[in-house]
Amino acid sequence: MSSYFVNSSFPVTLPGPGGGGGQAAAESFLGQIPLYSSGYAADHPLRHYPTAAAVAYGAGTTGVHQDKPYTASYYQQTANGAYGGHRAAGVGVGGTTGAGPCDYATAAAAAAAAAAAATSFYRDKEHQCSLEEHQLALGQDGLHRKAECAGLGGKSLFGDPMDDKQSSVPIYPWMQRMNACNGTFGSPGRRGRQTYTRYQTLELEKEFHFNRYLTRRRRIEIAHALCLTERQIKIWFQNRRMKWKKENKLINSSSSSSSSSTVNGTEEEEKQTE
C-alpha cells in the first residue's frame, strides 16, 4: 500500500503522448510533489483549488474519470461553499486552458451568507426575549435602585431628614450625650430626656388648666402650634396629670388632718367649759 493518498478531485490519468508517455509523465509529476496526507503541500495552489487542477491537467485526456465514492468532509464542504463562485468563474473564463482570476468579492459574499445563516439558526434556538428588551429591563431595575438609594440617603436612622452638613461631620463617642438613645455610655434602648422651652411649657400649662384630657384633634393642633410631636404632647399630659394627682392627695390629706384637729380642739374646749 502506498503512503500517497489520492485526492478525490485529482484526475486518474495525466496528459502525455501515449500510454507509456502518460505513465512516465505521471511518475515524474508525482515525484515532484511531497507526500502529505491530503495529497498536496500546505502552500501548493492545487491544495486549495482541486477543481482548477482537474481542469488544467485533465484537458488533454480523452477518458472520462469518475469521482471517488469518498464522502466530503466538513472542511471540504465549507471550501466548496466559499469558493464555489470562484471555481465557476474559473471554468467560464479560462475554459480548458486554465483557471480564471481569483474573485474575492464572490467568495466574501458567500462567506457572509453562510455566517448569516448560522447566526439566524442559533438565534432561533434562543429564548424569545431579545437583547434590547433584556437591556431595557436591566436599565429600569438600575434606575429604580438608584431612586431608592437617593431617597434613603437623605434620611437618618429614624426616617427624619438630615442636612448634608450633619451627615458629612463625623460623630465621635465623646461628642455624644450621656443618655443618648444610641450613645456609648447609655443603654441601647434608652431615649434622651425631652426638654421644653419656657414658651412651650407655658402654653402646655395653660391648656392643662382648662383641659386635663386632650382629644386627638386638639392634640394635633397643639403639636403643630408648638413644633412638637403628638407623642411628646401625650407624654407631657400624662406626667402632668400624675403630678396633679399627687398634689391633690397632699392637699386632701392636709385638709383632712386640719379638719380633724379643729374638731378635736372644739371638743376639748366644750369639755373645759362644762
Curated annotation (Swiss-Prot):
<dbReference type="InterPro" id="IPR017970">
    <property type="entry name" value="Homeobox_CS"/>
</dbReference>
<protein>
    <recommendedName>
        <fullName>Homeobox protein Hox-B6a</fullName>
    </recommendedName>
</protein>
<keyword id="KW-0371">Homeobox</keyword>
<keyword id="KW-0805">Transcription regulation</keyword>
<dbReference type="InterPro" id="IPR001356">
    <property type="entry name" value="HD"/>
</dbReference>
<dbReference type="InterPro" id="IPR017995">
    <property type="entry name" value="Homeobox_antennapedia"/>
</dbReference>
<comment type="similarity">
    <text>Belongs to the Antp homeobox family.</text>
</comment>
<keyword id="KW-0804">Transcription</keyword>
<dbReference type="Pfam" id="PF00046">
    <property type="entry name" value="Homeodomain"/>
</dbReference>
<feature type="DNA-binding region" description="Homeobox">
    <location>
        <begin position="189"/>
        <end position="248"/>
    </location>
</feature>
<dbReference type="InterPro" id="IPR001827">
    <property type="entry name" value="Homeobox_Antennapedia_CS"/>
</dbReference>
<keyword id="KW-0217">Developmental protein</keyword>
<feature type="region of interest" description="Disordered">
    <location>
        <begin position="248"/>
        <end position="274"/>
    </location>
</feature>
<dbReference type="InterPro" id="IPR009057">
    <property type="entry name" value="Homeodomain-like_sf"/>
</dbReference>
<dbReference type="InterPro" id="IPR050296">
    <property type="entry name" value="Antp_homeobox"/>
</dbReference>
<dbReference type="GO" id="GO:0005634">
    <property type="term" value="C:nucleus"/>
</dbReference>
<keyword id="KW-0238">DNA-binding</keyword>
<dbReference type="GO" id="GO:0009952">
    <property type="term" value="P:anterior/posterior pattern specification"/>
</dbReference>
<dbReference type="InterPro" id="IPR020479">
    <property type="entry name" value="HD_metazoa"/>
</dbReference>
<dbReference type="GO" id="GO:0000978">
    <property type="term" value="F:RNA polymerase II cis-regulatory region sequence-specific DNA binding"/>
</dbReference>
<keyword id="KW-0539">Nucleus</keyword>
<dbReference type="GO" id="GO:0000981">
    <property type="term" value="F:DNA-binding transcription factor activity, RNA polymerase II-specific"/>
</dbReference>
<feature type="short sequence motif" description="Antp-type hexapeptide">
    <location>
        <begin position="171"/>
        <end position="176"/>
    </location>
</feature>
<comment type="function">
    <text>Sequence-specific transcription factor which is part of a developmental regulatory system that provides cells with specific positional identities on the anterior-posterior axis.</text>
</comment>
